[in-house]
Regions:
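Hydrophobic anchor at the start of a short beta-strand
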Residues: 53, 76, 156
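Glycine-rich adenosine-cofactor-binding loop
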Residues: 31-34, 41, 50-70
Length: 177
């Protein structure tokens, strides 16, 4: 699909028989992470406040998150263990950076069961009630990342609704809805 091509990652494949030939099939790749994340995030966004976002991690899911945020005209910055031309390191996160990026999305597996006593190394003390912390992890329902955000008054959301919405999107693709 055009969105999966732009993102550069596929997590759902549609297999269709080529018309008129029973031996050939066409495969089309889709990215339902994009759909699930975007649909679950929209109700939480206040565009007067949420103009910039930090995306923790640089794996496949981070690309879908970045594309969804960009489509909502939210400026993004990737944060990774290693610096690169398109990302900063956790060590570079200052009070000013946290302050100006009101959305922080964890796309890493940090905090996932059974390693629940782990979380991204960010300066949580600079979070406020204007911040929105979104963790793609959904087990446990409240990760240490979300718990620390909640402690400072941030709006928090786990990845459970995203998971459900991406499953529905995949179902629609496979059943041509």
């Amino acid at each position: 699909s055009p969105i999966a091509e732009k993102i550069g990652a596929v997590n759902t494949i549609m297999v269709e028989r080529v018309e008129g030939d029973m031996y050939f099939y066409e495969l089309t790749g889709y990215n339902t992470d994009y759909t699930g994340f975007k649909q679950s995030l929209i109700p939480l966004i206040n565009l007067d406040i949420h103009k910039k976002a930090l995306i923790l991690g640089t794996g496949g899911a981070s690309k879908a998150v970045a594309h969804a945020l960009s489509d909502m005209d939210i400026e993004i910055t990737f944060v990774s263990r290693k610096t690169g031309k398109e990302c900063i390191s956790y060590g570079e996160l200052t009070a000013d950076i946290i302050s100006s990026n009101k959305i922080i999305v964890n796309t890493t597996p940090l905090g996932t069961f059974p390693d629940t006593n782990n979380c991204p190394d960010i300066p949580y003390s600079h979070l406020t009630n204007e911040h929105l912390l979104y963790d793609l992890v959904y087990n446990p329902a409240e990760t240490m990342f979300l718990s620390k955000g909640k402690e400072y008054g941030a709006i928090i959301k786990n990845g459970q609704e995203m998971l459900k919405l991406q499953a529905l999107a995949a179902w629609d693709i496979w059943n041509k809805q």
